[in-house]
Amino acid sequence: MATSAIQHSSFAGQTTLKPSNDLLRKIGASNGGGRIIMRRTVKSTPQSIWYGPDRPKYLGPFSENTPSYLTGEYPGDYGWDTAGLSADPETFAKNRELEVIHSRWAMLGALGCTFPEILSKNGVKFGEAVWFKAGSQIFSEGGLDYLGNPNLIHAQSILAIWACQVVLMGFIEGYRIGGGPLGEGLDPLYPGGAFDPLNLAEDPEAFSELKVKELKNGRLAMFSMFGFFVQAIVTGKGPIENLFDHIADPVANNAWAYATNFVPGK
């Protein structure tokens, strides 16, 4: 399903406005010492190959006519919605928002699933580096030490972890959906300001490209997370160890070999 971001001309939480030199005018001394009047313009349509009717489609030149509601207005729109899940405008807007949020979580999750294993294989000591085994350490006698260091976070209660998760995530989601601390109308997907310390949204054209890149990498990360779950069930190993096993013996360690020999519960 081709879903995407919630907006098309609003950048970094509020409309990105780029004053050009010819839009600055100084009124003479007759206006009390002079004052600056700034008129700002907005580019509503990104000038990019990823937008508009001529954007790349999901099957390239073999793509059929795309649905009328997929116009290329939003990033990540490849014209694919075979099931018509986004035909309703409200559903379409909701799906775009859900995809962006889940993409970001998946990218963080994929990093969290692989990075501890990489560090562990390079000599960094963890209590448990495999992502789906790490959480169970909280049930051990000594509890769970983050990064294997008891001086960081020493967790011993699953209920306390659950409560903190609910409270913190509820607060963050409320902040996001509410448009900021005072309902300031910040964009729920691209709030900008303190959330854009590198000023990546300063240039509207560059930002429109970054939105596409975010979704492309996010979709890949969601598929990766699905693969990590399947690997955990089938092999009982983490993604990095599975990768090393495959490199060492590609014939014996691949999806087809495991699929033909997999017996649930063994």
UniProtKB/Swiss-Prot annotation:
Give an example GO cellular component term for this record.
photosystem II
Localization, UniProt: Plastid, Chloroplast thylakoid membrane
Annotated residues that bind chlorophyll a 5 are located at 213, 231
Q: Which residues bind chlorophyll b 5?
A: 165, 262
Q: Membrane-spanning regions, if any?
A: 152-172, 220-240
Membrane-protein topology: Multi-pass membrane protein
Q: Name one GO biological process term.
A: response to red light
Q: Where is the transit peptide?
A: 1-38
**According to its UniProt record, how is this protein modified after translation?**
Photoregulated by reversible but rapid phosphorylation by STN7 of its threonine residues under state 2 (red) light conditions. Dephosphorylated by PPH1 in state 1 (far red) light conditions. Phosphorylation triggers the formation of the PSI-LHCII supercomplex.
Say what the protein does: The light-harvesting complex (LHC) functions as a light receptor, it captures and delivers excitation energy to photosystems with which it is closely associated. Mediates rapid phosphorylation and migration of LHCII-PSII to photosystem I (PSI) after transition to state 2 (red) light conditions, thus leading to the formation of PSI-PSII-LHCII and PSI-LHCII supercomplex to balance the relative excitation of PSI and PSII. Involved in the production of reactive oxygen species (ROS) and stomatal closure upon abscisic acid (ABA) treatment. Required to prevent water loss.
Q: How does it assemble?
A: The LHC complex consists of chlorophyll a-b binding proteins. Component of LHCII trimers made of LHCB1, LHCB2 and LHCB3 subunits. Associated with super- (PSI-LHCII and PSII-LHCII) and mega-complexes (PSI-PSII-LHCII) containing LHCII and both photosystem (PS)I and PSII, in state 2 (red) light conditions.
* Recorded family membership: Belongs to the light-harvesting chlorophyll a/b-binding (LHC) protein family.
**Protein name per Swiss-Prot or TrEMBL:** Chlorophyll a-b binding protein 2.4, chloroplastic
Q: Which source organism?
A: Arabidopsis thaliana
